[in-house]
């Protein structure tokens, strides 16, 4: 045995299992600007100290394994290991802690959300020492952000492309989501766009099924877009869902959309995967297409308060991977979304810089430097009576998307679109005049009903509709 091999195998190495906290719990550690920081909500198994649980998370999501290995001596663990550097008990919860973990930047491949998540959340969530584990937030350092392209275009470029300023954009998901032929689908798209909407949308599970193949849908929707544009003088779009079973097929659909000259395509970024999403985002930037992102399957990951991953992390990941719009809840509709928490990750999507604010669920100050912003999309169980609240909550840089709230109008699709456009214009005008949308919202809508019979009919249909359930996503 050579002296070199003898040194590796014997010096400083003792086989066996040792406590994680001896190596990975480092409360004296001063975080670096280049570290990726994570806030985990940790629920240890009975008898497991929080320091050991936090250290276990740091170890298993970086360089650690269940036993001491002699190859530890072949590298610098201090350079590459994750560190649990701070632990806070969760107020009002028994045996639950927020454990803060710092990861050296060298652990992650440049420009890869896939690799970042594989490391940080890929394996540790099944760890037996933990009863539950939730990733609440990430601080992405500027040095890592600059390795990503981010959104294909961003908010300002989109407004310039569409020539639409000073108000939220209006959309509609075509219903029924499945079962329509391509021609009938295109008819519904035309009627909604002709009535005053900016966008219509494929539902997330509309891909290329036997009743409506993707190429037929793309052709009829393009015809609807051009006809509506010619008649209204406004730029229109339809989110053509390019999501497919393979990346190659997805790109083929995006290429066809570009050849048709439409402005925007769509992707289901969680079910489709981050690698596919980043590839599509790169194609969209190179070819002038906007990219709408649907978050189908997000609630499987983020709905439970104690286990999984908060949507603010998925939102940050999307801003890195690339998308110009993303669904973000409504606060007021049928889908989950507590107001302050929702506004917290809406700001993370749009703003260049967000301060740490635990009251809104923001655990870290985050700078996005020159990364373009993403438009949040409010959709799910909303209708004209919600328009004042949505306009006040989300502001101009948003997309307000009414599916049933457009197509469910008693007079048809086009009058439903008219009702939504009139309600939005009335709310924007009232806001610009200094009126309080939160206090006077219903009055503003009723006043607009006097000169819009379409809006009056919509208000009558949905006057009693409410979705009042306790939000599970709380601080």
From Swiss-Prot:
One of its GO terms (biological process) is reductive pentose-phosphate cycle. InterPro entries: RuBisCO, RuBisCo_large_chain_AS, RuBisCO_lsu_C, RuBisCO_lsu_C_sf, RuBisCO_lsu_fd_N, RuBisCO_lsu_N_sf, RuBisCO_lsuI. It catalyses: 2 (2R)-3-phosphoglycerate + 2 H(+) = D-ribulose 1,5-bisphosphate + CO2 + H2O; D-ribulose 1,5-bisphosphate + O2 = 2-phosphoglycolate + (2R)-3-phosphoglycerate + 2 H(+). Belongs to the RuBisCO large chain family. Type I subfamily. RuBisCO catalyzes two reactions: the carboxylation of D-ribulose 1,5-bisphosphate, the primary event in carbon dioxide fixation, as well as the oxidative fragmentation of the pentose substrate in the photorespiration process. Both reactions occur simultaneously and in competition at the same active site. The basic functional RuBisCO is composed of a large chain homodimer in a 'head-to-tail' conformation. In form I RuBisCO this homodimer is arranged in a barrel-like tetramer with the small subunits forming a tetrameric 'cap' on each end of the 'barrel'. Heterohexadecamer of 8 large chains and 8 small chains; disulfide-linked. The disulfide link is formed within the large subunit homodimers. This is Ribulose bisphosphate carboxylase large chain. It comes from Stellaria media (Common chickweed). The lineage of its organism: Eukaryota, Viridiplantae, Streptophyta, Embryophyta, Tracheophyta.
């Amino acid at each position: 045995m050579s002296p070199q091999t003898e040194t590796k195998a014997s010096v400083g190495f003792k086989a066996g299992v040792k406590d994680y906290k001896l190596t990975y719990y480092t409360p004296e550690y001063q975080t670096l600007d280049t570290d990726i920081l994570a806030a985990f909500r940790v629920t240890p198994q009975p008898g497991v100290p929080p320091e050991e649980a936090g250290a276990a998370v740091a170890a298993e999501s970086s360089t650690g394994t269940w036993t001491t290995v002699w190859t530890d001596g072949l590298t610098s663990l201090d350079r590459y290991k994750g560190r649990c550097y701070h632990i806070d008990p969760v107020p009002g919860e028994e045996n639950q802690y927020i454990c803060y973990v710092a990861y050296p930047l060298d652990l992650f491949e440049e420009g890869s959300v896939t690799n970042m998540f594989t490391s940080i959340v890929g394996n540790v969530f099944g760890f037996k020492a933990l009863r539950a584990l939730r990733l609440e937030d990430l601080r992405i350092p500027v040095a890592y952000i600059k390795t990503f392209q981010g959104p294909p275009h961003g908010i300002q470029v989109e407004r310039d492309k569409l020539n639409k300023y000073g108000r939220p954009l209006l959309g509609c998901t075509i219903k029924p989501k499945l079962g329509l032929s391509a021609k009938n689908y295109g008819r519904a798209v035309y009627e909604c766009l002709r009535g005053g909407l900016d966008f219509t949308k494929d539902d997330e599970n509309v891909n290329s099924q036997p009743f409506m193949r993707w190429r037929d849908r793309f052709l009829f929707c393009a015809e609807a877009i051009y006809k509506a544009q010619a008649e209204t003088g406004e730029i229109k779009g339809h989110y053509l869902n390019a999501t497919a079973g393979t990346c190659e097929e997805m790109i083929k659909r995006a290429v066809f959309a570009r050849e048709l000259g439409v402005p925007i395509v769509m992707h289901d970024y969680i079910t489709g995967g981050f690698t596919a999403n980043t590839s599509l985002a790169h194609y969209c930037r190179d070819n002038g297409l906007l990219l709408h992102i649907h978050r189908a399957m997000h609630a499987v990951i983020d709905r439970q308060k104690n286990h999984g991953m908060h949507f603010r992390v998925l939102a940050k990941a999307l801003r890195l991977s690339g998308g110009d719009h993303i669904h973000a809840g409504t606060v007021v509709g049928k889908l989950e979304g507590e107001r302050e928490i929702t506004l917290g990750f809406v700001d993370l999507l749009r703003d260049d810089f967000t301060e740490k604010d635990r009251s809104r669920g923001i655990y870290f100050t985050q700078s996005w430097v020159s990364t373009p912003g993403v438009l949040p999309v409010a959709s799910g169980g909303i209708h004209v009576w919600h328009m004042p609240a949505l306009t006040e909550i989300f502001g101009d840089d948003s997309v307000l998307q009414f599916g049933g709230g457009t197509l469910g109008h008693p007079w048809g699709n086009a009058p439903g679109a008219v009702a939504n456009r009139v309600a939005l214009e009335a709310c924007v005008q009232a806001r610009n005049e200094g009126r309080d949308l939160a206090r006077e919202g219903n009055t503003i809508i009723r006043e607009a009903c006097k000169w819009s019979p379409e809006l009056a009919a919509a208000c009558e249909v949905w006057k009693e509709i409410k979705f009042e359930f306790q939000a599970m996503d709380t601080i």
